[in-house]
């Protein structure tokens, strides 16, 4: 499942969302996947449990979080949601706070998680200007067009 296709098919993009805490921000992304029947509601708690156990493991770059749990924690099919925040939030990460872009990932197996999910997200942000381009997006179509341009350039 490609990042772009998943976002388009599942209508799982939310731009300029408002959240007071990192937990609320993560819930917005998970709720989009629940609505699209990609994950069960318990996936959210699994992500919170992971943070309690390992710290903010999914804050992977300055401003960027990739919340995800394990396949057996309620994943029905592979999918992604993308959320940008109106106001960046602290996720208690030493190097990469504050966060205002969240790409929530659900993968049916570890292989898909690593090869498909992470590589597509790395590809999107290989050009660091794409962080600001994404922050500037105000419509779902603008996000999809940005991903299309990135894929065409790769």
From Swiss-Prot:
Annotated Gene Ontology cellular component terms: cytoplasm; transmembrane transporter complex
Superkingdom assignment: Bacteria
Effect of inactivating the gene: Cells lacking this gene are unable to use L-ascorbate.
Domain PTS EIIA type-2: 6-150
Keyword line: Cytoplasm, Kinase, Phosphoprotein, Phosphotransferase system, Transferase, Transport
CDD domains per UniProt: PTS_IIA_fru
Positions of the catalytic residues: 68 (tele-phosphohistidine intermediate)
Pfam families assigned to the protein according to its UniProt record, in alphabetical order: PTS_EIIA_2
Signal peptide (UniProt feature, chain positions): none
Role played: The phosphoenolpyruvate-dependent sugar phosphotransferase system (sugar PTS), a major carbohydrate active transport system, catalyzes the phosphorylation of incoming sugar substrates concomitantly with their translocation across the cell membrane. The enzyme II UlaABC PTS system is involved in ascorbate transport.
Name of the protein: Ascorbate-specific PTS system EIIA component
Biological source species: Escherichia coli (strain K12)
